Amino acid sequence: MAVRGSGTLTPFSIQAILNKKEERGGLATPEGRPAPGGTEVAVTAAPAVCCWRIFGETEAGALGGAEDSLLASPARTRTAVGQSAESPGGWDSDSALSEENEGRRRCADVPGASGTGRARVTLGLDQPGCELHAAKDLEEEAPVRSDSEMSASVSGDHSPRGEDDSVSPGGARVPGLRGAAGSGASGGQAGGVEEEEEPAAPKPRKKRSRAAFSHAQVFELERRFNHQRYLSGPERADLAASLKLTETQVKIWFQNRRYKTKRRQMAADLLASAPAAKKVAVKVLVRDDQRQYLPGEVLRPPSLLPLQPSYYYPYYCLPGWALSTCAAAAGTQ
């Protein structure tokens, strides 16, 4: 059975509502016996009035009979209302009729209302009050709005929402899914841009091929360079036209030639500034494949050898036996 909990509704069956309507439309009481006088009209008219919002229409005949019965005998109507409100048949939790009856009981319990007014509220003739309570129930059951939505509504954010915004059960739009989808799409686009940028790496510059000058062109350029190291614009253009070269080729050739000349000049200056080597008399050891020294002279190394720099004694190509003799003499010392 469906029971109304705190702020929640248990689902019900439409077929159960239709069955209840047919049973109550058969002029029979919930207990299966006729009610006291005047009650049958009120109980029979109640289901049609209670279900007017569910089925979209009301039975005009039942409403008319209810109004006539109310106008004819208010006392019997009050008795019927009290009996229907207190009896288990008027409070059925198996269908939405129980919710309607509960709402109308709330409307009927408003202080200051007369018995006739209570009967009219119970039968659905006074509908604005019941609709107000129903609206309050819907507001209580609706999900609470989040802080972000409240701040957006307060700040007056009227930005248009896309059709793909999801709708929550309470009717509130949830833009989170769209934002996630947008971020995912932007992440996908960013990933695609990065993939496109990776193969677009800067290509290594192609090595420029050197211009091949003929011997006649080089000879003429050398002759002009020895005569004039710097050329003006018209002179460069005239020389390039005479040699069938471009002005850029002539300009670069003169630049390279000036740099080459400068390096040669610096090397010559460095050699000129170096100290001159001293000339030392050296005894000839071998001449015409004949030894010019005694065996004991080679064993005595010169006394000034450790004190003098090595560049004073140039290297001589000695025969193998002389080198072995020098090594043996060094080992004995």
Curated annotation (Swiss-Prot):
Keyword hit for Nucleus: yes
Family annotation (SMART domains): HOX
Tissues where the protein occurs: Expressed widely in mesoderm at the gastroduodenal junction (at protein level). Expressed in visceral mesoderm and embryonic skeleton. Expression is restricted to immature proliferative chondrocytes during endochondral ossification.
One Gene Ontology term from the biological process aspect of the record: animal organ development
GO cellular component: nucleoplasm
Keywords of the record: DNA-binding, Homeobox, Nucleus, Repressor, Transcription, Transcription regulation
InterPro entries given in the database record: HD, HD_metazoa, Homeobox_CS, Homeobox_NK-like, Homeodomain-like_sf
DNA-binding region: 206-265
Gene3D superfamilies: Homeodomain-like (1.10.10.60)
Biased composition (Basic and acidic residues): 137-148
GO molecular function: DNA-binding transcription repressor activity, RNA polymerase II-specific; RNA polymerase II cis-regulatory region sequence-specific DNA binding
Residue spans of biased composition, Gly residues class: 179-191
Role: Transcriptional repressor that acts as a negative regulator of chondrocyte maturation. PLays a role in distal stomach development; required for proper antral-pyloric morphogenesis and development of antral-type epithelium. In concert with GSC, defines the structural components of the middle ear; required for tympanic ring and gonium development and in the regulation of the width of the malleus.
UniProt name for this protein: Homeobox protein Nkx-3.2
Biological source species: Mus musculus (Mouse)
Lineage: Eukaryota, Metazoa, Chordata, Craniata, Vertebrata
